[in-house]
Amino acid sequence: MHKSAMSVSQKLWPSLPLQHRIRRMWWTYAALAFLAVVASLWTSGEIGQHRAEAALEEQARMDVTLNAALLRTVLEKYRALPFVLSQDTALAAALVGNDAGTFERLSQKLEILAAGTKAAVIYVIDKDGIAVSASNWREPTSFVGNDYRFREYFQGAVERGQAEHFALGTVSKKPGLYISQRISGSNGLLGVVVVKVEFDDVEADWNASGTPSYVVDERGIVLITSLPSWRFMTIGRIAEDRLTAIRESLQFGAAPLQPLPLDMVRNLGEGLDVVEIVMPGDAGKTRFLDVATSVPATGWHLQHLVALGPSVDAGIREARMLALLILLPLLAGAAFLLRRRHTIALRISSEQQAREELERRVVERTLDLSQARDRLQAEIIGHKSTEQKLQAVQQDLVQANRLAILGQVAAGVAHEINQPVATIRAYADNARTFLDRGQTAPAGENLESIAALTERIGSITEELKTFARKGRGSAEPTGLKDVIEGAVMLLRSRFAGRMDTLDIDLPPDELQVMGNRIRLEQVLINLLQNALEAVAPKAGEGRVEIRTSTDAGMVTVTVADNGPGIPTEIRKGLFTPFNTSKESGLGLGLVISKDIVGDYGGRMDVASDSGGTRFIVQLRKA
C-alpha cells in the first residue's frame, strides 16, 4: 500500500532537481525579459529622438530659409531708393540753393514718398552733417536740424558713396537700418540722402509663427528679433574694449549688451546646434534646435529656434510604444513556449516508467518500419524505371511522328528530285556529244549546270536526312529563321500546288530561341501541315500566315489560317492523345508538338472559330 502511494506521488509531483531547474529557468527568463525591455526602451528612445530631431531640422531649415528670404525681400525693396533719390536733380538743386522754402517743399515730397514706400523715415543731410529735409518734418521727433556728422552711415556715404548701418535712433529711440547714398554735384559733395528701414512687420510675422527668430551682426549682437527683450543682447561675450567703443558710438544707445541666456549643448553640423535658453517669463531652461543661415548681401546671420521638448518627447514616446507593441508579444510568446517546455518536462518526468515499455514497442515497430522502407525503396526504383521507359516511349513517339511526316513528304521530294535528275541526264548526253565534236566550251557549260543541279538535289536530301535524325533533345540557341525555312522546304514538295497560300514574315537572322532545330521544325511542320490541309477546300482563297514577335524575353510564333476552324468537340480535347478529326490521323501530332515546346520552357495555345484557327507558340528567347 505504501509503495503504491509513493508511485502515485512520483507521477503527480516532479523531482526536486527538476523543480529547481524550472525555477531557475523562470528567474533567467525574467532577468532576460527585463533587460530586453530596458534595452528596447533605450534603443527605441534614441531612434525616436533622432527621427524627431531630423524632422524638426528639416522643418527648421525650411522656416529659416523662408525667414531669410522675407528679410532679403525687405532689404532689396529699400536699397534702390537712396540711389534713385541721389540722382534727382531737384534734390541736388535744393542743396545747392540752400533755401528754407525749397527744403520745406522737399520735405513734403519725401513725406509722400515715405508713405508710399512704407519707409520709416527718408531725410536729406547737407555736407556739414545737418538734416535739412525729412519725411517726418511735421512730427515732434522731426529730424530736420539735427546734426548727424557722428553717424557712421553719414561718414561712410561721404567716403565710399553709400553705406548701411543698423543703429538705435537718437531722436525716435527706434532701431532700424540706415541706408545712405552720397549726393554729388559739379563742385563735389552736396550732401547725403538716408532711408531708415524699421523691421516691425518682419518681427511681427516671426512672432506670429510661434517660433523665436533673431538676426545678429558679425559681432554677435542681436539686431532684429521676434522677442523684443532680446534686442541688443549678444550671443557671446564681447571684449571689454570693443564694448566701450560700441557704447561710445551710440549705435545702440545705452543698451547693456548683455549675453543671451543661452547655453550650447551640442553641435549637430554646420549652422545647426542644440541649445538651452531661459525664455522670457520662464524660470527654467528650454531646449531648442538652433538653425542659422547667412542673410545675403549683409554680414548678418539669421537664427531660428525650434523647441525640441514636445516634438522629441512625442517621437520618443511613439517609438517606445511601437517597440513595446513588438516586444511584449514576443516576450509573451517566449513565456508560452517556456511554459509549454516545462509542461512537457513535467509530463516526461511523470511518465518515466512508461518510457521503457514505449522503447520496447519502438524496437518492434522499427523492424516493421525497416521492412516497409525497403518495400518503399523498391517501389521508388520501379517508378523511376517506369518513368525512364515512359520518356523513351515519348522520344520514340516524337521520332515516329517525325518519320510519318517524312514519309508524307517523301513522294513529293522524289518528284522534285526526278526533274533535276532528268535534266542532268540530258546535260550529260549533250556534254558527251560536244566532247565528241571537240567543242569543250559548251561541254563545260553543261557540266557546270550538272554540278548546280546536284547541289540542289544535295540540299533537299540533306534537309530530309537532318530531319530524320533524332537529334539532341537539350535546349540550345537556335536560329528561328532557319527553323521556319527548313520546315517550309520539307513541305514544299508535298504541297507544291498550295505553297502560294503561305504568307511568311521571316524574323531577322540574329533572332534565336532556346530549343533544338530538328524538334522545332517538327512542331512547325505539324502546324503548317494542318493549316495547309484546312485551307485546301478554299483553293485560291486559302491563306496561311506565319508571324513572329518578341516580348519580355519570349518569342511568339503564330501560325494562322482562314480554314473552317476546329469543331468544338475536337477542340476541347485537342491536346489529348488519339483525338483527331482526320480519317487517317492518329491524333498525336499536336500532343507531341505541345510536349516538345513544353520541354524547352515554352507553351502552345490555340484559338479557333468559324473564321479560322490560330496556333500560338511561345519560346524562350536565347
Swiss-Prot record:
SMART domains in UniProt: HATPase_c, HisKA
Transmembrane intervals: 25-42, 321-338
Topological relation to the membrane, as annotated: Multi-pass membrane protein
Broad class of where this protein is predominantly found: membrane
Matching CDD domains: HisKA
Statement: the UniProt record of this protein carries the keyword Transferase: yes
Keyword Transmembrane helix: yes
Histidine kinase domain span: 412-622
E.C. designation(s): 2.7.13.3
Catalyzed chemical reaction(s): ATP + protein L-histidine = ADP + protein N-phospho-L-histidine
The entry's keywords: ATP-binding, Cell inner membrane, Cell membrane, Kinase, Membrane, Nucleotide-binding, Phosphoprotein, Transferase, Transmembrane, Transmembrane helix, Two-component regulatory system
GO annotations of cellular component type: plasma membrane
UniProt function note: Member of the two-component regulatory system DctB/DctD involved in the transport of C4-dicarboxylates. DctB functions as a membrane-associated protein kinase that phosphorylates DctD in response to environmental signals.
The protein's name: C4-dicarboxylate transport sensor protein DctB
Lineage: Bacteria, Pseudomonadati, Pseudomonadota, Alphaproteobacteria, Hyphomicrobiales
Gene (UniProt): dctB
